[in-house]
Amino acid sequence: AAEGGLKYWKLAGTWLEEERAEYRLARSLLQAQNHASAVAHAERCVDVCIANNASPFERFFGYAVLAIAQLRGGDRPACAVSRQRALDQYAMVAADEKQWCEAEVNELRS
């Protein structure tokens, strides 16, 4: 379902929907324990954010899911870099948006 969502958001949506669909697919792949594919889609999520000068809120989620995927895939050094990038973005997230980041922040800090 997440793969289908990404396919159709690429056709019908903007970069924002594509980025969020990449995030959702990375999360689904983590649930399926397909860590390598999760990392690839998390990287794509981050790439879409960078290419479109996304807000810290969007970049936070990209780097967060990338760090989580890298950790679960056993790449601790890459995870440490992505984790720090996620937390750096989180520091710049608007106060009224921080509540939406709590689950990922907790996951990054555990």
Enumerate the language-model features and the residues they cover:
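Amphipathic alpha-helical segments of tetratricopeptide repeats
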Residues: A2-K10, E43-A51, Q84-A95
